[in-house]
Amino acid sequence: MGNCFVKKISSDIFNSNYQMLYSELSEQEDLLDFLETKYTDFGILKTDILNYERDSETFKTLLQVLPIYKKTKLRYNLIERCLNNCPPHVKDALIIEIMKAKKILETLDVVFMKIMIGEFTICSDNVNQLLNKFSIDQTTLCDMEKINTLIDLDEENSKRLLTEIDPLLHQETGLYQALPNAVTDPPSEQRAATKKCYEGFTK
């Protein structure tokens, strides 16, 4: 984007003075609008936000975090629109991404608030580390859940084959009851809660 200039009126028609307009001005306006919209309901007023603008270090930190928040919010909205109509083989990947985006947005909400009340400052390197941590954690959790699901399916198929293909063996040996985690057994509370979380994103 090129530089913008504003012409200053002068009594001398042969001499024109120009003043460069910096992009930081529009970024600061965006940040002020964002903070006012998001935190007015929490009791942070426009005058409070303007006071933060005078604190250059705090405002600089807020300016660093805002682009990441806006980018993640756009990605979250895009995934949310695609989730309902996407092919089944794509849905699992989108569910992972929307969970990551939601977690990042929630965390950045806390970061904004803590910066606003002066609890701490955060640099761009720390934010990038935070994003990488979420990416790793959420992917790992999803992979673990998929492995657990595959184990469940394998157990169910094994039990079905034993009872349907060789019912006499089952009747004589009681092998079905001896198998761990029978189909009729209720799932553990932790696994049920995890599956419920995933199902919530698919609705």
Curated annotation (Swiss-Prot):
Pfam families: Herpes_U44. This is Tegument protein UL51 homolog. Plays several roles during the time course of infection, including egress of virus particles from the perinuclear space and secondary envelopment of cytoplasmic capsids that bud into specific trans-Golgi network (TGN)-derived membranes. GO terms for cellular component: host cell Golgi apparatus; viral tegument. Phosphorylated. Palmitoylation is necessary for Golgi localization. A lipid is attached at C4 (S-palmitoyl cysteine). Keywords: Host cytoplasm, Host Golgi apparatus, Lipoprotein, Palmitate, Phosphoprotein, Virion, Virion tegument. Belongs to the herpesviridae UL51 family. It is found in: Virion tegument; Host cytoplasm; Host Golgi apparatus. The lineage of its organism: Viruses, Duplodnaviria, Heunggongvirae, Peploviricota, Herviviricetes. Oligomerizes. Interacts with U75; this interaction mediates U75 incorporation to virions.
